[in-house]
C-alpha cells in the first residue's frame, strides 16, 4: 500500500517510519528534516530502533491509497488545499490534536475522511532523527461515529505494519476524551515548562482537572456522553503513563513555535454553553505568549 504522511514532524515521522516497515511511504514536510531524510533516511530511536528510507518531498504525490494527516491544527486548511490537488488520495486519516480538523479536510476533499487518535510519544531530536518515547496504539473510525469500509482498510494497513490499531464506532466520544486529556496536560505543562507527570500533583493538578471537567461539560452540550470524572480519569491516566514525556505544546513553546491552543482549549471555549474559566484562562495565557514570543515559522 502507498501511504502518504502529510506532516513530517515528530509524530508524523514516527508513524511514517513504523508504517514503512511494510508499506511504501512518502513523507511530506519541509525544512532541514525532510532534506536529511531524503539524503540519509529516517532514523527512529528510543522505544523503537529502526532506520527506513521513505520518499521525502515538500508536496504530495499524484496519488496514494492512504493519506495520514499529522500537521498542526492551524495548518489543516493548507493541508486540505494541497491534498485536493492530488488525482487520488484514497482514504484520508487525521491523526491530529484538537477538534475540527476532520470537518476542514472533508469540506475540501472527495475522499473518505476518518478521525484517529494515538498515544505514541514522539520527539524530533535532530534532522532525520525521531525518538519514540512510548509505543502506543492507533484508534480510528468515521468522525461522526459508526462503521465504514474505509476505516477497516486503514486499520488493516496499520496492523499489517505491526502497529496496534483499533477500528472504533464511537469516535465522537473518543475525540472529546482526547480533547479533555490535551486540554488538561498540554497548556499546563507548556506554561509551567514541566513534564507531563507534574499535572498529577499540586499546584498544577487542580488546574488540569478543571480544564478536563470543563471539556466534559462542553462535550455533553454537544450531545456526547462524557462525565467530568471520566474526563479527569482519562487525563490523569495519560499523565501517569507519560509522566516523563514532554508534551507537544511544551515542545512548541520551548522551540518558539505557534501552538495548537486554539484547537484545544480555544475549541472548548467556543463550544461550551456555560462558563469555562480554566480553559479560557489557559487559552488566553498561551495565546498571549504566542502574540509576543512565537516566531512566524510553522514547521
Regions found by a protein language model. Name each.
Residues 3, 24-25, 90-92, 113, ...:
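Hydrophobic anchor at the start of a short beta-strand
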Residues 17-21, 81-85, 107, 266, ...:
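Short, well-ordered alpha-helices that flank and scaffold nucleotide-derived cofactor binding pockets
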Amino acid at each position: 500500500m502507498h501511504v502518504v504522511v502529510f506532516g513530517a514532524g515528530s509524530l508524523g515521522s514516527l508513524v511514517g517510519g513504523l508504517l514503512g516497515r511494510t508499506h511504501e511511504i512518502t513523507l511530506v514536510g519541509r525544512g532541514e528534516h525532510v532534506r536529511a531524510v531524503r539524503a540519509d533516511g529516517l532514523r527512529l530511536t528510543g522505544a523503537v530502533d529502526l532506520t527506513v528510507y521513505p520518499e521525502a518531498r515538500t508536496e504530495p504525490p499524484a496519488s496514494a491509497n492512504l493519506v495520514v494527516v499529522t500537521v498542526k491544527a492551524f495548518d489543516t486548511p493548507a493541508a486540505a488545499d494541497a491534498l485536493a490537488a492530488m488525482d487520488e488520495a484514497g482514504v484520508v486519516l487525521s491523526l491530529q490534536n484538537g477538534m475540527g480538523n476532520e470537518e476542514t479536510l472533508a469540506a475540501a476533499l472527495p475522499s473518505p475522511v476518518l478521525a484517529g487518535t494515538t498515544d505514541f510519544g514522539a520527539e524530533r531530536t535532530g534532522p532525520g532523527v525521531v525518538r519514540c518515547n512510548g509505543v502506543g496504539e492507533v484508534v480510528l473510525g468515521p468522525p461522526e461515529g459508526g462503521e465504514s469500509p474505509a476505516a477497516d482498510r486503514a486499520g488493516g494497513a496499520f496492523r499489517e505494519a505491526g502497529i496496534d490499531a483499533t477500528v472504533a464506532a464511537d469516535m465522537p466520544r473518543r475525540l472529546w476524551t482526547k480533547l479533555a486529556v490535551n486540554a488538561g496536560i498540554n497548556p499546563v505543562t507548556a506554561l509551567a515548562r514541566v513534564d507531563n507527570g507534574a499535572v498529577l500533583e499540586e499546584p498544577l493538578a487542580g488546574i488540569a482537572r478543571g480544564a478536563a471537567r470543563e471539556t466534559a461539560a462542553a462535550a455533553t452540550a454537544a450531545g456526547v456522553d462524557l462525565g467530568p470524572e471520566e474526563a479527569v480519569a482519562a487525563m490523569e491516566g495519560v499523565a501517569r503513563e507519560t509522566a516523563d514525556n514532554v508534551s507537544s505544546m511544551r515542545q512548541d513553546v520551548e522551540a518558539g513555535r505557534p501552538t495548537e491552543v486554539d484547537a484545544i482549549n480555544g475549541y472548548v471555549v467556543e463550544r461550551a454553553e456555560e462558563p469555562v474559566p480554566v480553559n479560557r484562562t489557559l487559552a488566553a495565557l498561551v495565546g498571549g505568549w504566542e502574540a509576543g514570543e512565537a516566531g512566524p515559522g510553522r514547521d
